[in-house]
Amino acid sequence: MIELKKDEETSVKGPYGEIDMVITPCTVKENTQPVLIMAHGFRGSMEGGGRAKYLADLAGEIAHVVRFNFNGSQLLSRQIEELENVVSYVKQRYAGSKIVLLGRSMGGCASLVAASRDAEIRGLVLWATPNDLQLTFLNSLGKSGYLKLKNGENLYLNDERGELVLTPDFLHDINKYDLIELLSNWKKRPLLVIHGAKDETVPLEQGQQSYFLAGLPKRLVVIPNADHSFTNHGHKAAEEVFSWLQHILI
């Protein structure tokens, strides 16, 4: 049996404050083992309801795994900056290692942008990731909430995830990014698109379109009956990611 190493809690100075992170060290001792960096989704966290930890322990058999929390801003541009900051930290700490990005939902959008800008990123996982942010947030915020932002008003959210104020800048910011174009230009680096068949937030059709737009090598995994958060299918999704990582990294 492989003995799991203790996770390391640390932080790195980011453009908007300290970025808290957890590193699951690879069970193989070599420092040049690959690194998987995981970015969480909209209003999420690096814990991901326990699903992120399960994947980190699995992937730790072949890679160091870095999970981190965005600093509270929901602006995609700021999240991209913070992710790029984490990538820079990883490059310094694990010099010469292959780096793969995994983004969950909106974290996948940040990962797609960051990886498209950085040819040193060796692979990308889009986990329940939208390619049409306007349509996605019209769906998730509801028409009235979306129109408030579009009309220049703040939107106040208060639910089981806590309180959040979205400003009109949120919509203006996501309009800066043409994810369809980035996907169309993604070539020669491995891509995994993993999506739930019953995703209620980002319809499966978006995941399928992302897959078809990208160049080879690529893989599409659709998890039957899985919702946007993979609530009852987190282990299955993690195992699919691990299988893909084994294929591209070993």
Please annotate each region the language model reported.
Residues 1-28:
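N-terminal cap/lid segment of alpha/beta-hydrolase-fold proteins
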Residues 9, 19, 118-222, 226-250:
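The alpha/beta-hydrolase serine catalytic core
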Residues 42, 69-73, 130, 226:
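Short beta-to-alpha linker loops that shape the active-site pocket of alpha/beta-hydrolase fold enzymes
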Residues 59, 114-115:
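Aromatic pocket-lining residues of Rossmann-like dinucleotide-binding sites
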